[in-house]
Swiss-Prot record:
One of its GO terms (molecular function) is serine-tRNA ligase activity. Keywords: Aminoacyl-tRNA synthetase, ATP-binding, Cytoplasm, Ligase, Nucleotide-binding, Protein biosynthesis. L-serine binds at T242, A243, E244, E296, S396. Its main location: cytoplasm. ATP binds at R273, S274, E275, E360, I361, S362, S363. The gene is serS. It holds the Pfam family tRNA-synt_2b. InterPro entries: aa-tRNA-synt_IIb, aa-tRNA-synth_II, aa-tRNA-synth_II/BPL/LPL, Ser-tRNA-ligase_type_1, Ser-tRNA-synth_1_N, SerRS_1_N_sf, SerRS_core, tRNA-bd_arm. The keyword Transcription does not apply. It is found in: Cytoplasm. This is Serine--tRNA ligase. It is an enzyme of class 6 (ligase). Consists of two distinct domains, a catalytic core and a N-terminal extension that is involved in tRNA binding. Belongs to the class-II aminoacyl-tRNA synthetase family. Type-1 seryl-tRNA synthetase subfamily.
Length: 435
């Protein structure tokens, strides 16, 4: 969340910056609440000062032998204490309203982020690789997978429902190989530590990374089937929408040493999303699933290092695509298309031949101190006593299912076989083709 000081001392400037991303800050409501806070705060401080001043008189009265006077002062202090407690409750209520208001406010976009309303206003930065030309009729990944007997959507519908998949044989192995290749690259060459994390998280974790309270409808939540287990209240947990949630929360409520930064972590997990706002979109194939795998990259940095870290992290995701020899383009998201907690975001979009377009395969974001403030994730500089908030970054390195889509379609051959990228062949027992 934003620093509340910005809403107190730079309200108009903050409102103008948020307006760039299409968010209208309710300035009047904030001003009204802030005026109430200041007024009640003054009353609280005055009552505390008066009580402290009068308290000193008790000893003076007792020393002078004036017990009645001392008792009278004690009564006054009791009344002041009751008034003070009531005012503190009022102050807490106003502060709670301000905090609740702040939680609905997105991050401020970086000055370098282009203005715009939606994905149509994103700005292309670069392209890598040339889309192939084919002298035969192209098939999409669904036809290729079903023809090879490796993608079974019908069984997934029977078992669970739409937007799920059953993979078989070499297709399942390819899916595993892609993830393992990514993990090996990021841990062996890019300096990340591999993490294994829970796939179920509590509400504090989802709050920390910004999914709650605003995006609860996009998640899958568990519903306890019994009231108690071994006399313990059942926990209400949620399936992770991305490994960003558990991995980033590893630094929640911690103070790192400056020497330990940056912290670079990666994890391969399934991800679960309700896709509540995606009805009718990408209903065919693996592009938009309720359950999909992803290799996530997370960096925890000092504030002055985070923008350079964003370039580095994005480059690590790009390296995956380059080694797989998949054409892609890099775009910087405009203010209107960025995620709620992002300060700046790059998307990598891979070429999908059957659709004759580039599709998002990775989103890499600098969250600045937005998540860190929610999580109270801090670090202490050498020689300093007061800790500071870290900056957090995350990105897909990459989405496994969409990477598989790109490999199947870009590497298809006239006879229906799929050429396995060279870097994946060692994970496929040396096989060069599927089919």
């Amino acid at each position: 969340m934003l620093d509340s000081k910005l809403l107190r001392t730079e309200l108009d400037e903050t409102a103008a910056k948020l307006a760039r991303r299409g968010f209208k800050l309710d300035v009047e409501t904030i001003r009204k609440l802030e005026e109430q806070r200041k007024s009640i705060q003054v009353e609280v401080e005055n009552l505390q000062s008066t009580r402290n001043s009068i308290s000193k008189q008790i000893g003076q009265k007792m020393a002078a032998g004036d017990k009645e006077g001392a008792e009278e002062i004690k009564k006054q202090i009791g009344t002041l204490g009751s008034d003070l407690d009531a005012k503190k409750v009022e102050l807490e209520q106003v502060m709670a309203q301000l905090d609740e208001f702040t939680l609905s406010v997105p991050n401020i976009p970086d000055d370098e982020v282009p203005d715009g309303k939606d994905e149509n206003d994103n700005v292309e930065i670069s392209r890598w690789g040339e889309p192939k030309t084919y002298d035969f009729e192209l098939k999409d990944h669904v036809d290729l997978g079903e023809m090879g007997g490796g993608l079974d959507f019908a069984s997934a519908v029977k078992i669970t429902g739409a937007r799920f998949i059953v993979m078989k044989g070499q297709f399942a192995r390819l899916h595993r190989a892609i993830a393992q290749f990514m993990l090996d690259l990021h841990t062996e060459e890019h300096g990340y530590t591999e993490m294994y994390v829970p796939y179920l998280v509590n509400s504090d974790s989802l709050f920390g990374t910004g999914q709650l309270p605003k995006f609860g409808k996009d998640l899958f939540h568990t519903e306890p089937l019994v009231e108690k287990v071994n006399d313990e209240e059942p926990r209400k947990l949620s399936l992770i929408p991305t490994a960003e949630v558990p991995v980033t929360n590893l630094v929640r409520d911690t103070i790192s040493d400056e020497a330990d930064l940056p912290i670079k972590m990666t994890a391969h997990t399934p991800c679960f999303r309700s896709e509540a706002g995606s009805y009718g979109r990408d209903t065919r194939g693996l592009i938009r699933m309720h359950q999909f795998d992803k290799v996530e990259l997370v960096q925890i940095t000092k504030p002055e290092d985070s923008m350079n870290a964003l370039e580095e992290l994005t480059g690590h995701a790009e390296k995956v695509l380059q080694l797989l020899e998949l054409p892609y383009r890099k775009v910087v998201l405009c203010t209107g298309d960025m995620g709620f907690g992002a300060r700046k975001t790059y998307d990598l979009e891979v070429w999908v031949p059957a659709q004759e377009t580039y599709r998002e395969i990775s989103s890499c974001s600098n969250m600045w101190d937005f998540q860190a403030r929610r999580m109270q994730a801090r670090f202490r500089r050498k020689g300093e006593k007061k800790p500071e908030l870290v900056h957090t970054l995350n990105g897909s390195g990459l989405a496994v299912g969409r990477t598989m889509v790109a490999i199947l379609e870009n590497n298809q051959e006239a006879d229906g076989r799929i050429a396995i990228p060279t870097v994946l062949q060692k994970y496929m027992a040396g096989a060069t083709h599927i089919g």
